[in-house]
Amino acid sequence: MIVLGWMFFVGLVCYMGTFPELMPPTLKWQERWPVQESKTQLRRRALGEDLLQNHVEGI
């Protein structure tokens, strides 16, 4: 259980990019959030266009 907790902590630290104690409340992942949103929107648009093309073609 201790090993799983340590692995979770290290994974969280790697995800945020640094240790929480060394950073102010604005963490690096919050700075990258708009980039992630734009990627998600592009993916949704691409999927939506594919679905529309498939629907029009009758597939």
Swiss-Prot record:
Keywords: Membrane, Mitochondrion, Mitochondrion outer membrane, Transmembrane, Transmembrane helix. Coiled coil: none annotated. Signal peptide: none annotated. The chain crosses the membrane at residues 2-22. It comes from the Eukaryota. The keyword Transmembrane helix applies. This is Mitochondrial sheath formation-associated protein. It comes from Homo sapiens. The gene is MISFA.
